Design a protein with these regions (language model features):
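A structural signal for alpha-helix termini and helix-coil/disorder junctions
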Residues: 29-32, 36, 171, 193
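Hydrophobic N-terminal alpha-helices or hydrophobic patches in metabolic proteins across all domains
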Residues: 10-12, 16, 74, 81
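Low-complexity, flexible helical/coil segments
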Residues: 18-21, 39-44, 172-175, 214-218
Length: 221
């Protein structure tokens, strides 16, 4: 369950500077929401840092070469509290991707104005309730027709060029855009300091899961 959003942009907006400006605005809204939530429920104390740290997936690999991508996220989030990891989907110096991304969605292959590859990323925080990093949003500047063709070729998916969306984009019938998804239940978990998604979202859980959570002091809806 996500709040999915898309915004029309111009060619000049397809930069890392613009991407990071949008990230700042989204993170600012999250901070404001945390403040208002803690104001309404004084037993909750804010823990998110004032600023979000930006780092490219390649830089993260170089910082923690012996760790897995998830372990790298844990380490950098524990250090800074809130992080935007950029360039997710492109291959790094070790020949691997930090994480997978579809070829026809985010632009993870364009070289930005700072020489780094990719115009997308994930908003992550250090979540003390669980003692690990926690993803709140995946987002990015979407592919233009050049990036689309390049990424389809990289992934060996050139046959997808014939699909409706792809043809519309390649024919300049769609606007350039930036977009993403913000996890509703995940954000509610963070705002209310919950450890299990079942504490804020109605769902079906096994008796074993309910008993385990009850023993840990968690009441599932």
């Amino acid at each position: 369950d996500e709040w999915d959003w898309e915004a029309v942009i111009t060619e000049s907006d397809r930069t890392r500077h613009y991407l990071e400006d949008v990230v700042h605005r989204i993170y600012g809204a999250i901070l404001r929401t945390e403040f208002l939530t803690c104001e309404a429920y004084p037993q909750l104390k804010p823990f998110l840092p004032k600023d979000i740290h930006f780092i490219h997936a390649q830089e993260l690999l170089e910082m923690y070469p012996d760790k897995t991508p998830k372990e790298r996220e844990d380490a950098i989030c524990k250090k800074y509290g809130a992080v935007f990891v950029e360039g997710i989907g492109c291959r790094l110096s070790n020949g691997e991707k930090h994480d997978g991304r579809a070829a026809d969605y985010d632009d993870w292959s364009t070289v930005a104005e700072d020489g780094k590859v990719g115009l997308n990323g994930d908003i992550l925080i250090w979540y003390p309730v669980l003692g690990r990093s926690f993803e709140l949003s995946s987002m990015g500047i979407r592919v233009d027709k050049v990036a689309l063709l390049r990424q389809l070729e990289i992934e060996g998916q050139e046959e997808r060029e014939q699909l409706y969306f792809h043809q519309q984009l390649l024919s300049d019938k769609l606007p350039l855009s930036i977009g993403g998804g913000i996890g509703q239940s995940r954000l509610c978990m963070v705002m209310l300091h919950k450890a299990h998604i079942g504490e804020i979202q109605a769902s079906i859980w096994s008796d074993e899961m309910r008993q385990e959570c009850e023993a840990a002091g968690m009441s599932l809806i």
